[in-house]
């Protein structure tokens, strides 16, 4: 769902992403035999506003999601309305396997945020998701989740080597103190560790009030935590002929009160300088477990070049 990629609330940040380019869409469709369909984010939100409020609240409540006490019935209703409007589009199209929205930069069209909706669509229909309309991550999530069936999360990666740029962006005072900071990163997206479905996080999953100033005051986000332990970062490269894998660990979760990073994943890996050179995107997928060898086999099936940073 998008209308004007590159324009909107923070065009100076979002002006150009490769996944918005016509070349990206056409290459993706040709390479993988899939179809990428754009639908209006503005129109689906206008339709959401027309949906009966009681029906929308009942729909949300039927999901039995853990919610912070600060999340109001009005916020739940807005989520339910948008969910039902999106379901109308899905039913009309048919055969939808993945979904996303340009939700941050075009937040002016929306009174809520779609994070909780992605959870419902995944739980009910197995539809995978991406944040910010990142179709490269959507494709990566679809292929790798359905191949590995391991818990996966999309997030922003902030290597400590990025320095002040990351600290400023998340409004934190400093990175956590560690012995080898060149080999650490924070995983943060929209105020928390990033979105993952409830089934991947157990009890460490809750609907929370929004954090970022860019979104509507009635918006929400999910505070969730993947299991601590082995993980890989992985994503298909924009060339669509290569996949980059970074083995490491989810070491713990760290909190920064009164910032844009209330709960972040602390990621530890090897060869941080190489990661800075070759990481294909700041949007990364965290996949739980020791998945390096399995992804190598997936790469053979798809004919991808396979790069491991370790």
Model features per residue range: what roles?
Residues 109-112, 154-170, 178-179:
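Aromatic/acidic polysaccharide-binding cleft in carbohydrate-active enzymes
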Residues 74, 196, 201:
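The substrate-binding groove and active-site-proximal loops of carbohydrate-active enzymes
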Residues 1-17, 166-197:
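Conserved anion/nucleotide-ligand pocket segment
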Residues 28, 58-61, 120-124, 175-179, ...:
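Short, surface-exposed linear patches
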Residues 1-150, 154, 158:
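Conserved, well-structured core segments that form the ligand-binding/active-site neighborhood
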Residues 84-87, 138-163, 278-302, 308:
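C-terminal functional extensions of proteins
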Residues 159-167, 199-210:
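Short, highly charged low-complexity linear segments
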Residues 202-310:
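Extended hydrophobic packing segments that form well-structured cores
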């Amino acid at each position: 769902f998008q209308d004007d990629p590159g324009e909107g609330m923070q065009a100076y940040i979002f002006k150009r992403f490769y996944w918005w380019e016509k070349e990206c869409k056409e290459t993706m469709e040709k390479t993988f035999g899939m179809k990428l369909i754009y639908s209006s984010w503005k129109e689906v939100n206008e339709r959401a506003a027309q949906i009966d409020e009681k029906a929308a609240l009942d729909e949300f409540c039927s999901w039995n999601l853990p919610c912070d006490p600060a999340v109001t019935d009005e916020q739940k209703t807005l989520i339910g309305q948008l969910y039902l409007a999106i379901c109308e589009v899905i039913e009309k199209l048919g055969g939808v396997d993945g979904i996303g929205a340009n939700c941050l930069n075009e937040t002016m069209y929306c009174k809520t945020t779609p994070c909780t909706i992605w959870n419902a669509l995944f739980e009910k229909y197995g539809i995978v998701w991406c944040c910010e309309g990142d179709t490269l991550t959507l494709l990566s999530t679809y292929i790798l989740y359905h191949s590995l069936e391991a818990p996966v999360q999309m997030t922003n990666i902030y290597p400590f080597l990025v320095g002040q740029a990351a600290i400023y962006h998340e409004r934190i005072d400093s990175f956590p103190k560690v012995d080898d900071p060149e080999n650490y990163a924070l995983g943060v997206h929209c105020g928390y560790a990033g979105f993952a479905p409830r089934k991947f996080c157990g009890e460490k999953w809750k609907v929370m009030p929004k954090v970022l100033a860019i979104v509507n005051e009635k918006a929400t986000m999910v505070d969730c935590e993947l299991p601590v332990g082995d993980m890989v970062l992985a994503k298909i490269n924009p060339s669509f002929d290569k996949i980059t894998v970074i083995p490491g660990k989810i070491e713990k979760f760290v909190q920064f009160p009164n910032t844009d990073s209330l709960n972040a994943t602390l990621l530890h890996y090897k060869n941080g300088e190489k990661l800075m050179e070759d990481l294909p995107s700041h949007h990364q997928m965290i996949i739980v477990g020791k998945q390096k060898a399995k992804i190598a086999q997936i790469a053979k099936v798809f004919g991808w070049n396979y790069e491991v940073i370790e």
